Amino acid sequence: MILQALVQYYEDLLANGKITRPGWTSAKVSWALELDENGQLMALHPLQQEEKRGKKTVLAPCQLQVPEQVKRSSGVAANFLCDNSAYMLGIDGKGKPERAMQCFAAAKELHLAILQNVPGQAAQAVQNFFINWDPKAAEQNPALEQSLKELYKGGNLVFLIRENYVQDDPEIQEAWQRQCDKNTDAPEIRCLVTGQKAPLARLHPAIKGVTGAQSSGASIVSFNADAFCSYGHEQGGNAPVGSYAAFAYAQALNYLLADREHVQRVGDTTIVCWAAGGETAYQQVAMDALFAMDAPVSESDVRNAVDKLVHGQSVEWQNVTLDPQRHFYVLGLAPNAARLSVRFFWQDTFQTLLDNVQKHYDRLEIVRPAYDKFPRLGVYWLLQETVNTNSRSPSAAPQLAGDVLRAILNNTRYPATLLDGVMMRIRAEQKVTRGRAAIIKAYYLRNEDPRCPKEVLTVENNKETNYQPYVMGQLFAVLEAIQMAVNPDINTTIKDRYFNAAASTPATVFPTILMLAQKHMQKMSKPQKIYYDKQIAALAGGKLEGSFPARLTLPEQGAFILGYYHQTQERYTKKVEE
């Protein structure tokens, strides 16, 4: 599935002129020789285009896809369908007519050999041209005499028939492909990617650009030990991929990885994405939606576009109409010595992607401190909430990044390791950040558990719920506020000493911290004391029934942490408003 999608993307890029095909290259072309159906030269057309170079505007050759060109030294070696005037016309203005004739003879031999028995008017016209063209009479040809001076300055020429470049003719392209295939002695196999018969790719091209992999490139498909082989096959014969498919998927993947604007790294995973058809506008919207990246447009514009696409409406984005039903792909790769591991591969419609991502961010939505200016928590920052920043290598667990992204893309349950990592950091640091509270909320909204009910999984403080673990978290925040009100310059609070025990074994802690609160309140002014007395009474007296529980389960601890976070943020919000 991965290789098939990449091969299709390669062909989309090829159709858009963004990438070269096997046996082809992008070359600078200055002139087009227009032939009639009989191979007679009718006209010479300049292909130069105006181009800005600094403050100057100059004429520059255009870029065309042409058959792959040879690497010349000092010998005579002709190119197919695209070459200079010495090879295409037998003239060069360098005062060496004998060498120009040799070049033309080499080009004639090459073209007649490749185009022999090729059907179609284009192939026949080119053959007739080389058979009938007389280099000695070239300078007197009416089609050339007006442009000889410019022609002698150099530049490549191609053939043009009926306003179509000859190298674009399907029958000629097939002939050139057959010529390229002759250069391999690989056995013919049924390609498992295309389903067509093709020469076997014994070794696949290297993939470059994956963070942490070898700089020279790594392989997705490789067999370098007998233990990996079966039925007597060697190397690529164990997974028969044709040379074209191997070239195509590698070209497409290297193209994606080279586009650094649309590559994201999370943990050890390098992520690329693409849309069927090859338009980069889809990648830009998807990357911003998934990773909360800085977009060249406003946050509101991105949200409006995503909202319309989620509801099945097309959107104009950077002069491209985004289709919500367009097939979209996301691939995560991780380094593994000389190979690459596929962390995940996702494919569905663009609408499904954005819908799943939007649901993820909706679950993460939670009240945030006034100083926090980020409306969304990207995947990178979520994973950082599981990291010990004081460690030698502060990075998330390698497998976690792939597991979390897979859950987001598929709108499935979050991995338990995400919650475990967050709870571990809270216990170690006694610090409940916006990110950690948001993860707990999102986790239990998706991974439903009655011990952490939806009534406590709210954006802001829920004053109506009577769920005991959540209310105890609220109460703990109030008791901490009392201590801080009496001792505003205090460095450590009851949170630093008692938070872990209060969240896991409340019966052992709450009697102590309630007694401490009463002592602190004796130092308060009367209005302040009345205010906090009412808060404690509303929570401890009105909602907590009986004694404090001896132990809280992990989901109940999550509810406790959310209660504490919500109540704390409400206190800070009131201070900001005041």
Predicted feature residues:
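Short Cys/His-rich metal-coordination motifs, predominantly Zn2+-binding knuckles/fingers
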Residues: T194-Q196
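Conserved phosphate-interacting/catalytic interface
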Residues: M1-I189, F228-E578
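Short catalytic/ligand-binding loop motif for oxyanion handling, primarily in non-cytosolic enzymes
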Residues: L200-R202, R339
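Short microdomains enriched in Cys/His and/or Lys/Arg
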Residues: R202-N238
